[in-house]
Amino acid sequence: MQQKIRSPFVVVMGHVDVGKTLLLDKIRGTSVAYREPGMITQHIGMSLVPWPAVEKFAGPLVDRLKLRGRIWIPGFLFIDTPGHAAFSNLRKRGGSVADLAILVVDITSGLEDQGVESLKLIQSRGVPFVIAANKLDRIYGWKSVENRPFLFAVEEQEWHAVATLEEQIGKLITQLANLGIDADRYDRVRDFSKQVPIVPTSAVTGEGVADLLLVLAGVSQRFIPREKLQVRDGPARGVVMEVKEERGLGVVADVILYDGKLRKGDVIVTAGLDGSRQAKVRMLIMPKSLEEMRDPEDKFMAVQEVEAAAGVRVVAEGLEGVVAGAPLLAVWDPKDLPEALKSVGEEIAEIKIESDKEGVIVRADTFGTLESIILFLRQQGVPVRKADVGPPTHKDVVEAVLSRRKNPAYGAILAFNVKVPPEVETEAQSSGVKIIRGEILYRIFDEYVKWSTEVKTKTVEQVLSQLTRPAKIQILPGYVFRRSDPAIVGVKVLAGTLKPGVTLAKDGREVGKVMQIQRQGKPVAEAVAGDEVAISIQGDVIVGRQIKEGDVLYVYIPDEQARQWLFRYKQYLRKDEVEALEEYLKTRKKSA
């Protein structure tokens, strides 16, 4: 028996206001306008665009590109919610449930912050993608015709409109090249395994949408192994996209099934903050087809079973506390239940990190985004001490305080798309813990980098203020003003920085403490290499006995401080200070 092939899952991503939702609406419209009678194109949380509908919509372009009869995928399943969170939640062990991504970019302004973030997330999950250079209708002088393929449209434009388009695409190609991505307009790409295709589109007029769907089909067949799209006739596997309370139904979960079959009465295993849990399916809800949807208020129907690939609303006892991004497994044989609970528990444990190692604390709204953030932070060299889903807690503040003791730059909680309880905010402020929150990962990270740099600088300054700086001086012949109690002599600073309060050493042995430094009869805070100054030395020292005119003296530096200078803070010493320190340590060795 031939195994069923499912449609690839497609996620639309990009910066705010680039036209993601409008483009999705335009794509979904093709499935409505060119659907087969009775076909359910709308699922819970996603929309099916069948390949026959694409062929009807893009007929002339299909023929021009010689694709008729060559596409084996049944269609596309577009995730209805565009953006970062939806993509992050489409997670599974070893990769992503998403098979393809469309990165939507405003052709008039190029790649922006969230676009870059989306791009890095797509790459981190290894998902093939296509770039939709949207807002083609905004190109100066462009003449639009509704739903016209881009390849036909570009041939019918004035030269100046084409020139403007080429200029904007060129800028986008350069931006992508700076991120290490080789891209070009799709009709110029010769090797799709080496170059990312850019498809100019207009979500307003529909121009280029046919091209986008055909390029997606080509990319899917080029990069998605057929086995990945094969669906087993066994217990369902899926991912929770959203959990909410529905009047009359209680807590429900909107689930995307990517394999197997889910039936009414099935035991399912999923996860909450406290680990894996089981529930029993009471009802499965799907949208009605357009023909059945006679009453606008009556859009849904209960079904007995659902086969992958599908988006379905699951009503079950025990869904309270289940978190978006959690895996979902159906269990048909009770003997398989312990293994399913263990498997889901282990998968969640891989994301929820808690260890004694140094690092920041991370909080996110879903398991999917949490996993993405941890992956991103590690790539940026920021360790994570603890990560979890939901608002920050008292325990997080305690953990951050412990982290700060080891490294002040790790005394922070990064809160992605979650509210911070007022009492936790107050406790963090009084404990010196920084809470950085936001909805854009790059901005949270940039703010953390700025803050941690300030903390590191302040910490280093505090440490350096406690360390004795190296210096090398010579007693000037003929400039002994007082021989003892205290000795007052003229000296030249040969290297380093001399400050009051330091102890001087000769041949590695302490000889006295510098009480004051004067230049031309006035006290000064320090003297540097090349300065000639008078200093007073207190201690059991007599000029002519312990020290003599012409002697070279060094600032005495305790062994622990010398080690810190050499192995941790050497970059904060001037070259002459390093030389003074190294010479001083040699005199210590000789006297030892």
Swiss-Prot record:
GTP binds at residues 14-21, 80-84, 134-137. The keyword Nucleotide-binding applies. GO terms for cellular component: cytoplasm. Residues 80-83 are annotated as: G3. Residues 5-226 form the tr-type G domain. Residues 14-21 are annotated as: G1. Residues 202-204 are annotated as: G5. Residues 134-137 are annotated as: G4. GO terms for molecular function: GTP binding; GTPase activity; translation initiation factor activity. Function in general translation initiation by promoting the binding of the formylmethionine-tRNA to ribosomes. Seems to function along with eIF-2. Belongs to the TRAFAC class translation factor GTPase superfamily. Classic translation factor GTPase family. IF-2 subfamily. This is Probable translation initiation factor IF-2. It comes from Pyrobaculum calidifontis (strain DSM 21063 / JCM 11548 / VA1). The lineage of its organism: Archaea, Thermoproteota, Thermoprotei, Thermoproteales, Thermoproteaceae.
